[in-house]
From Swiss-Prot:
Assigned protein family: Belongs to the universal ribosomal protein uS2 family.
Key words of the record: Ribonucleoprotein, Ribosomal protein
PROSITE patterns xrefs: RIBOSOMAL_S2_1, RIBOSOMAL_S2_2
Gene (UniProt): rpsB
Cross-referenced Gene3D superfamilies: Glucose-6-phosphate isomerase like protein, domain 1 (3.40.50.10490), Helix hairpin bin (1.10.287.610)
Record-given protein name: Small ribosomal subunit protein uS2
Length: 295
């Protein structure tokens, strides 16, 4: 199992990963991941977050290294654009608008919707369309296409079930999680203090509402996927320096450039060697100046 570079607890603190929800909203199943509370807000134990993040990143790395497909899922407003951005950067797939029931368990229906989307695009791009259809009909087709794109843009090239699901906000994405469980698809998920960690193969205790936190998670996820992809390409004899595209992964030139910039994984210890005293002091200082996005 490959090991990644140590997770920087200070970086997690700066991103507000330690801020949970109000104590009145907690899920008792998260008790073991909670460090304490400040002003009626639960504080997440970042030592556990760092260690479990390392495990989750290794799962992402190994999945992509073996040519597996990853589906990133988060339809909440503050995560939507970030999820799409980083999924595209690492050549993977995403759902960021609305989870359509059966996206995993009833793939045939979803495939039909994707086919419908492609037909609409082809029709609208045709020069004959302006002659054969009225302006109203063209407008109706354009609206249908846009609606389908909102839900399907990130999975239109996904021809089979994903090998790993990566979720931010398990409460909001419970339907996606239930479908993945039915199909035995392993799940990486950020679990906040109001979350249920059951059925999550790789839980990462952390704030799932803060934009800064979400961006940090997605950046780490994408880097792990890119490193796995690079390793897979090396095994296949692909020269990343001269490669212009990799159709199986739907890579863009931006993705290839990102591959070259991604820091390498190392076989070092998974977590920063901070003492409990240092961690306690850093956490205390952070809580004194807290700026939580959770409620």
């Amino acid at each position: 199992m490959s090991k990644i570079s140590p997770i920087n607890i200070k970086e997690l603190l700066d991103a507000g990963v330690h801020f949970g929800h109000k104590t009145s909203r907690w899920n008792p199943k998260m008790a073991s991941y909670i460090y304490g509370e400040r002003d009626d807000v639960h504080i997440i134990d970042l030592r556990q977050s760092a260690a479990l993040m390392s495990v989750a990143l290794n799962a992402i790395y190994e999945t992509v290294k073996k040519d597996g497909k990853i589906l990133f899922v988060s339809t909440k407003i503050q995560a939507s654009d970030i999820i799409a951005e980083y999924a595209e950067k690492c050549g993977q797939y995403y759902v960021n608008n609305r989870w359509l029931g059966g996206m995993l368990t009833n793939w045939k229906t979803i495939a039909c919707s994707i086919e419908k989307l492609e037909k609409l695009e082809k029709t609208l791009e045709s020069e004959e369309t302006r002659v054969c259809y009225t302006k109203k009909e063209i407008l109706d087709m354009s609206r249908k296409k846009d609606k389908l794109l909102l839900s399907l843009a990130g999975i239109r090239n996904l021809n089979s079930k994903p090998d790993l699901l990566v979720v931010i906000d398990t409460n909001k994405e419970h339907i996606a999680i239930n479908e993945a469980v039915k199909l035995n698809i392993p799940i990486v998920a950020v679990v906040d203090t109001n979350s249920n960690p059951d059925n999550i193969n790789y839980p990462i205790p952390g704030n799932d509402d803060s934009i800064r936190s979400i961006r940090l998670y997605c950046s780490l996820f994408a880097d792990a996927a890119l490193q796995g992809l690079e390793e897979s390409m090396k095994v296949s004899g692909v020269d990343i320096g001269t490669m212009q595209e990799h159709t199986d992964k739907a890579l863009t030139s931006k993705t290839i450039s990102k591959l070259k910039q991604t820091k390498k994984f190392s076989k070092t210890q998974n977590i920063d060697e901070e003492t409990n005293t240092e961690f306690d002091q850093a956490l205390s200082d952070a809580c004194e100046n807290k700026n939580s996005d959770n409620t």
